[in-house]
Design a protein with these regions (language model features):
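Hydrophobic alpha-helical transmembrane segments in multi-pass membrane proteins
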Residues: 29-30, 84-93, 120-125, 158, ...
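Hydrophobic alpha-helical transmembrane segments
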Residues: 31-33, 42, 100, 110, 159-160, 164-173, 181, 276-278, ...
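Residue-level recognition of pore/gate-forming positions within transmembrane alpha-helices
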Residues: 39, 81, 100, 116-117, ...
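Membrane-embedded alpha-helical segments of transport systems
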Residues: 41, 73-95, 111-127, 317-320
Length: 320
């Protein structure tokens, strides 16, 4: 809901324009802007599909125009948008589920997930640079790149709700639900104040704000439907596996295959994640695999002399 409201208010377009202003003039600038824009959009959106639609509509045509093939342009956009789910503080619904699974605060999840998310985007940035070098591509023309200072200050109000969210999570240590709630309320009022100041007619400004808010609520509800159904279905699977004793038998089979070899066990976990990922969204996939494999990984690791923190195991499952 928070991401949908921010996107409806123009936050997604702002982050994309800011990305183009920052890296558009570099070699292969559109690809780097797509990666940076998707990463910043991932700050507010936990949906890879919404991220792809928001940024890809603008970045893919520009990447093709500057020399990238349509396949590479699509691959760069999709990979950077999918990685948006790894970017704190939102991280999709999986981060909230992970916090309840492990029994730690949401802040702990965000703290441990921040560096891997940055590393993933640095890797994408580097790969896009190598592709641009290989194709001998140049940056965008000065006339096509927005002014950085002007672009940054044009949407400064979009950063306020994000700072509210981070402040409440990090410094006040509020729960994720409370933090998101107050950040959403601040977003609604900040957008109202901005439109009231920007618009010439207060009545028209209020009408625009009201329409944006309603559309944001609708998009947020639609985004939650798919996630809710997937999590509910995954919960049924997890409950059935636990109640029938299949989990115990599965653990015995996996341990007999791995034979206390942690590397083999990690590889089997990756394969299971990838297979389930063909038909399940990220959150549902994480719920199923974490319920089956997280404890096994910790136990086998301890038996082999390795100490696997539970949060590291859950993040491993989440990433694959």
């Amino acid at each position: 809901l928070f991401g949908a409201l921010l996107e409806t208010a123009g936050g997604g377009k702002y982050f994309l324009d800011l990305a183009f202003a920052m890296v558009g003039k570099m070699r292969g600038g559109p690809a780097k802007a797509a990666i940076l824009g998707s990463g910043m959009t991932g700050l507010i959106s936990g949906s890879s599909i919404a991220n792809t639609v928001t940024t890809g509509t603008f970045t893919i045509p520009i990447m093709k125009k500057t020399g990238f093939s349509k396949e590479k342009a699509g691959a760069i956009e999709v990979s950077s948008s999918v990685n948006g789910q790894l970017m704190p503080p939102v991280m999709g619904a999986a981060a909230f589920v992970m916090a309840s699974f492990i029994g730690v605060t949401y802040f702990e999840i965000v703290k441990h997930a921040f560096l891997p998310a940055i590393i993933s985007y640095v890797a994408l940035f580097y790969i896009s640079h190598l592709e641009a070098l290989k194709l001998n591509l140049k940056g965008m023309d000065d006339a096509e790149v927005p002014n950085l200072k002007k672009t940054f200050f044009s949407g400064l109000h979009f950063l306020i709700p994000i700072f509210v969210l981070i402040y409440m999570l990090v410094y006040l240590r509020f729960t994720a639900s409370y933090s998101i709630f107050y950040a959403t309320i601040s977003l609604i009022f900040v957008n109202l104040i901005y439109l009231s100041i920007k618009g010439e007619n207060l009545k028209n400004s209020f009408k625009i704000w009201f329409n944006q808010t309603i559309v944001g609520f609708e998009k947020g509800a639609l985004n939650m439907v798919g996630v809710g159904i997937a999590i509910a279905t995954a919960g049924i699977i997890v409950g059935a596996v636990g109640s029938t004793g299949l989990s115990t038998n599965l653990i015995i089979v996996i341990e007999s295959i791995a034979k206390d070899n942690v590397s083999i066990l990690l590889f089997l976990t990756i394969i299971l994640c990838l297979l389930l990922g063909m038909g399940l969204p990220t959150t549902a996939n994480y719920v199923v695999v974490a319920s089956l494999m997280a404890t096994v990984l910790v136990d086998v690791g301890n038996a082999s002399g390795f100490i696997f923190p539970l949060i590291a195991v859950h993040l491993f499952v989440f990433y694959f």
